[in-house]
Amino acid sequence: MGKKKSKNQLNTGGVPNGVHNTKKEAALPPLGNKLGSASFTAINTLTKPALFSFYDDDITKNEGNVYDKALLSNASQLEMVPPSATARHERSLYAKIINTIAAFFILFIAGILFPMISECLFDNDQLAKGDIVSFLKHGIEIKNKIVAEPDMVPDWAVFGTEGVIFGSIVPFIDSFVRYQHQPKTRSSVYKNTLGSFIRCANTLLGLIFGIRKLEWSSSLQAAGAWSLLNIVLWLFFDGTLTVFFPGLVIGALSAFTCSQCFSQLSLALYFIDFYFFGFLMFSKLGRYLFN
């Protein structure tokens, strides 16, 4: 500690008699427009001790430099903020082509597996085994009409093409509504991951198992419960309107193409529920692969 100055060297204001109104505090170095003089004054008042003027100049000069350097260091750290996570380097054309081919191939394989899963959906009342896959078989009927030799094109190729179409609809819509340019929050990035797609697929398998094994009073009760659950699952897994409205349209088309759905409301709800959630699953896979 420095030696204290004698009382006869201080006036009533705590300033030495010989340098009253002549000694000025050294001005803090400017830090740009982000920090104004008011901020420096406030920080200076809070950090420097109240009895600052009682010490010798050699002590106060060194302490002032320490405080000023600390302020400069904090300001430099504020200016060195890393760029936003949304700023990505543009991929080369070759990388984009490889990514697109891989995405189409994976969606094609998923389209082949999807009818196999749908054949496992049935209950013990009105929904028989294989009824729900009738909507996907319309693609085979279209193939038989437009292809000169239908036997040359296998049925699994039709199902794979349908998988590519279902998985590409939402990424195609996103390119128009500029979904990829919206702020990438942690929740949105979390929802478009491979792990999220796997959880969605496991949920579909759990729903199919629940419809088959649980004791329902009627098919309408099971289909209605699935309809209410679909809203919660959509909010949990995705929550975007670009999936909700196209999913409803595809579900309604699947129910409209089934002749039995006109007389049985439970079958219509089954078709809407299954293909809405299936479209949600393909949309998540497509977003993950293309983005």
From Swiss-Prot:
The lineage of its organism: Eukaryota, Fungi, Dikarya, Ascomycota, Saccharomycotina. One of its GO terms (biological process) is sterol biosynthetic process. Belongs to the INSIG family. The gene is NSG1. The keyword Membrane applies. GO terms for cellular component: cytosol; endoplasmic reticulum; endoplasmic reticulum membrane; nuclear periphery; nucleus. It is found in: Endoplasmic reticulum membrane. This is Protein NSG1. It holds the Pfam family INSIG. Residues 1-96, 178-230, 283-291 are cytoplasmic. PANTHER family: INSULIN-INDUCED GENE 1, PROTEIN NSG1-RELATED. Residues 118-156, 252-261 are perinuclear space. Present with 1900 molecules/cell in log phase SD medium. Keywords: Endoplasmic reticulum, Membrane, Phosphoprotein, Transmembrane, Transmembrane helix. One of its GO terms (molecular function) is unfolded protein binding. Residues 1-23 are annotated as: Disordered. It is a multi-pass membrane protein.
